[in-house]
């Protein structure tokens, strides 16, 4: 009888714990967005944390949390990576030289022949491979989230059992 009471109490406590978004609202409003990142960094998988950092930089972390929609967070993560790649692409020396010379595109005749050869050697990534890798990353994130939830449940049961 005691065991059933403890188990039901534990289940009620776990079900009544505030979600990650609510915990962020509970914290003091005086804390800056930079102070929010360390608290989030330990509670969620790496890719979701990167998505939240991206949202935090945009200033709309709580409008759409990637933790509630993993597929949406993956899409946002991919968009963020594409933006980062575009920034890196535009900051490459060959690209800067081409833009300074007044070239309209990076594929102009003023481009270095070694860069063209390098680009020709690299095989294009298949779209199927890209989605396969994205699916695997999402599965790994879900597995990590389940493992974290199991760990927190074990800790809660240890606390209740003492």
UniProtKB/Swiss-Prot annotation:
It is found in: Secreted. The modification Isoleucine amide is found at residue 160. Residues 1-24 form the signal peptide. PROSITE patterns: CRF. One of its GO terms (biological process) is positive regulation of cortisol secretion. Residues 25-119 form a propeptide. It holds the Pfam family CRF. Residues 113-122 have a biased composition (Basic and acidic residues). GO terms for molecular function: corticotropin-releasing hormone activity. GO terms for cellular component: cytoplasm; extracellular space. Residues 91-122 are annotated as: Disordered. Transmembrane segments: none annotated. Keywords: Amidation, Cleavage on pair of basic residues, Hormone, Secreted, Signal. Disulfide bonds: none annotated. This hormone from hypothalamus regulates the release of corticotropin from pituitary gland. Belongs to the sauvagine/corticotropin-releasing factor/urotensin I family. This is Corticoliberin. The lineage of its organism: Eukaryota, Metazoa, Chordata, Craniata, Vertebrata. The gene is crh.
């Amino acid at each position: 009888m005691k065991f059933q009471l403890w188990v039901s109490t534990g289940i009620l406590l776990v079900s009544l714990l505030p979600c990650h978004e609510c915990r962020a609202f509970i914290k003091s409003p005086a804390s800056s967005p930079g102070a929010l990142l360390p608290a989030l960094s330990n509670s969620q998988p790496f890719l979701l944390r990167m998505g939240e950092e991206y949202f935090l930089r945009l200033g709309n972390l709580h409008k759409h949390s990637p933790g509630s929609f993993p597929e949406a967070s993956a899409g946002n993560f991919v968009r963020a990576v594409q933006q980062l790649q575009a920034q890196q692409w535009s900051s490459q020396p060959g690209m800067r030289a081409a833009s300074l010379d007044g070239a309209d595109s990076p594929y102009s005749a003023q481009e270095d022949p070694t860069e063209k050869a390098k680009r020709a050697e690299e095989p294009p990534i298949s779209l199927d491979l890209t989605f396969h890798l994205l699916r695997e990353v999402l599965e790994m994130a879900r597995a990590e989230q389940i493992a974290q939830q199991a760990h927190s449940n074990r800790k809660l049961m240890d606390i209740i059992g003492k």
